[in-house]
Amino acid sequence: MKSHIESLLEQTIESFKNQGIVPADFQARIQVDRTKDKTHGDLATNLAMMLTKVAGKNPRELAQLIIDNLPPSSHVAKVEIAGPGFINFFIDDNALATQLEQALNDEHFGITLPEPQTIVVDYSSPNLAKEMHVGHLRSTIIGDSVVRALEFLGHKVIRQNHVGDWGTQFGMLLAYMEELRAANGEQAQLELSDLETFYRAAKLRFDESTDFATRARQLVVALQSGDEYCNKLWQEFNDISLSHCHDVYERLGVSLTRADVHGESAYNADLEQVVKDLDAKGLLSESNGAKVVFQEAFRTKEGEPLPVIIQKADGGYLYATSDLAAMRYRSKVLKADRALYFVDLRQALHFQQVFSLAKLAKFVRKDMQLEHNGFGTMNGEDGRPFKTRSGGVVKLVDLLDEANNRALELVRSKNPDMDEATLTEIARVVGISSVKYADLSKNRTSDYIFSFEQMLSFEGNTAPYLLYAYTRVAGIFKRAEDIDLTDAKIVLEHDKEKELATKLAQFGETLYKMTDKAQPNMLCNYLYELAGAFSSFYEACPVLAADTPAQQGSRLLLAKLTANTLNKGLSLLGIETLERM
């Protein structure tokens, strides 16, 4: 409905151009918002106040002109002027009911789909040769929820898991594997459970032994030169590490696959050309033997130019180099209209610099959008970054195990007579969903406190509350299996019916905002408000015990669309629903 009002206003602006009220080349930025007070209508715009200067008229006079020139619409019951020139729109109840009936019979819930784009989404991207830890959670699940919503809206989404599968740490790991095999023979194999221990032991050897460090550096050079032996060992590390990553993805319900992996090593052959092209464009400078690019817009607090280091004095490449190669690939080969990067907020300056440089060097098309969607940190209840009791990094699998165990205790306490298999399955869904939703429901850019007690609560904006809300709505239909809804129509008579209907109609605009801002918490907030609106409706408006069959059918349709919307919304967040809790 919001997009319909925007369309009416766009047509009105065109009419103003034809009448000479505004210049023919005038570009209006039309903004329509939901009203907080329903006595002021359902939707409102400040367009009249925005046009005051260009039209040379006072806002209330312009507001009346806008109303007089609005195309006729059966969706609008009335339009009023308020205050200094706000225009309030009251939506027709019958039009709203028709919109919801259409949503019930459409896989896209009656949402007008945008012009499809090709969108590259870079997310998760852990460093290999280590197990995933809690620091990987936010990028992985925030990115995945945005990906799901973009695909639902009809975009072509290309997932890119830009794993850290290259670099000096691999020389250290290869050297340690050599030592192990020299001592234990070729049968020395890496196991997934050994990966973290292996990495720490290799790092200790690197720090303590000059000879070992020298050998590690030699192996890096050999690996970068395409040495077959080194490449075989490197591939072994990557396979073990990726196997672990995808076990975690499967457990989290994340949609990334092996086919989405396009790590740093994929751009090795392009790095030298990146340097040559920057040099040919006259962008490279030398600083202490390193090849760098200075951009006027980036300076230190003291006013000194801030470089982007492209190649170190020893010939090595950096993250900026591979990021530039990746951006060129995503623009020229993948033909992306938009590229979204879900990386820690602490990398903001890095991305500002490389995005600017990619445009300056024409590595990406001028019209391609590059977006760093940064996020804050997940902290413990002491307000500090989440750690183990000993101060170590928390493995993601350990966090999920703990969530599962706590969820199992919770579900068992509420259902002491439930069979073990059902308890286990419900606990699995509740545990994983609680971890994901606790993160996704927070503003992406904020730090947040991780609390098992809060996330497993059945009160407030939590996964257990929403999962229960869904089962409550879906449960109505287990008692209504014999009711035929073929000829049922939605009729909005009670205030709580209208409030629920209005909230249901906002699903599409919520997804538009969520994908535009890359903010899953917008969808979480919407689903929480929808569950609340249904609860108020259910208390005030008997469904199965309605006064008439027509009223019963109408309310069942509202309940059905609520269940469908909750189910789809949670699915877009990567959260499974349950039919029983």
From Swiss-Prot:
Its EC number is 6.1.1.19. It is found in: Cytoplasm. PROSITE patterns: AA_TRNA_LIGASE_I. It catalyses: tRNA(Arg) + L-arginine + ATP = L-arginyl-tRNA(Arg) + AMP + diphosphate. SUPFAM superfamilies: Anticodon-binding domain of a subclass of class I aminoacyl-tRNA synthetases, Arginyl-tRNA synthetase (ArgRS), N-terminal 'additional' domain, Nucleotidylyl transferase. GO terms for molecular function: arginine-tRNA ligase activity; ATP binding. Coiled coil: none annotated. HAMAP family: Arg_tRNA_synth. A motif ('HIGH' region) lies at residues 126-136. It is an enzyme of class 6 (ligase). GO terms for cellular component: cytoplasm. Keywords: Aminoacyl-tRNA synthetase, ATP-binding, Cytoplasm, Ligase, Nucleotide-binding, Protein biosynthesis. CDD domains: Anticodon_Ia_Arg (cd07956), ArgRS_core (cd00671). This is Arginine--tRNA ligase. Belongs to the class-I aminoacyl-tRNA synthetase family. Signal peptide: none annotated. One of its GO terms (biological process) is arginyl-tRNA aminoacylation.
